[in-house]
């Protein structure tokens, strides 16, 4: 593992004073007219590409950092990059894979990608508090990318690094239901759910029922930690950057609210 993310240098301030839309994947997206995003710079993550069933536009930047999700969706992510050369896919070089006994091992993502593509960029990722990334929003991603409690935090971190001055969140519902049909294993988490999950039914927590549909592997969400990370980011934002929650049905109150469609009336 290299010590610096030199490949990220070319993205620093690449979108100085521009606006970006960060698409989290909550079911509230189904209540929004996302055709407005045609021609906009949109960040996406995980299985967010399922939105392409409904819209012609594509994400400009795409991310997956969760150790369980990245390997469960690795073929899909590679195909996304292969089919969409104008989309840049950002992935961690390696991740800590949590096992049922509570122990973890390091597994390389980079080595399991079928072949190198120009639009796949790998980075080193470190936990909050590591001196290479700091308290929750690293402003020099060459040093390291913050290991988040939600991939949406990673997207905000990259948006700040790229120089965007207006960052609009959509689909950040920050609300989950885990029913009895979900298979649980591993250690018990603070919200009363075990850490390692496998779905057996349709997914009620995202905009597409197949997102974490039958057989999909995921980690138990910890909304308290998610919100705490969002709040850390808010405190660390540069003064010239405005982050606004333009979604609906969202329990994320760390950022100011704004109306999605009114953004396009400017």
Regions found by a protein language model. Name each.
Residues 1-266:
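Metal-ion/cofactor- or nucleotide/acyl-coenzyme-handling active-site neighborhoods
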């Amino acid at each position: 593992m290299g010590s610096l993310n030199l490949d990220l240098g070319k993205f620093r301030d690449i979108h100085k004073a521009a606006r970006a839309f960060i698409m989290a994947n909550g079911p509230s997206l189904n209540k929004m007219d996302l055709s407005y995003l045609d021609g906009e710079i949109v960040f996406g993550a995980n299985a967010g590409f399922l939105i392409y069933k409904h819209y012609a536009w594509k994400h400009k930047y795409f991310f997956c950092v969760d150790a369980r999700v990245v390997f469960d969706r690795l073929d899909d992510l590679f195909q996304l990059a292969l089919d969409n050369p104008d989309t840049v896919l950002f992935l961690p070089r390696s991740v800590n894979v949590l096992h049922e006994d509570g122990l973890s091992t390091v597994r390389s993502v980079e080595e399991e990608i079928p072949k190198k593509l120009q639009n796949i960029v790998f980075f080193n990722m470190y936990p909050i508090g590591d001196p290479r990334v700091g308290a929750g929003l690293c402003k020099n991603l060459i040093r390291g990318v913050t290991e988040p409690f939600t991939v949406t935090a990673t997207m905000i971190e990259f948006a700040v690094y790229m120089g965007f001055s207006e960052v609009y969140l959509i689909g950040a519902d920050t609300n989950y239901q885990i029913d009895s049909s979900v298979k649980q294993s591993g250690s018990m988490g603070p919200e009363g759910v075990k850490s390692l999950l496998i779905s057996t039914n349709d997914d009620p927590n995202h905009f597409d029922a197949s997102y974490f549909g039958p057989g999909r592997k995921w980690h138990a969400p910890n909304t308290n930690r998610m919100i705490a990370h969002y709040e850390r980011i808010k405190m660390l934002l540069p003064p010239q950057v405005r982050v606004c929650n333009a979604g609906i049905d969202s329990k994320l109150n760390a950022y100011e609210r704004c109306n999605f469609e009114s953004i396009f009336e400017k």
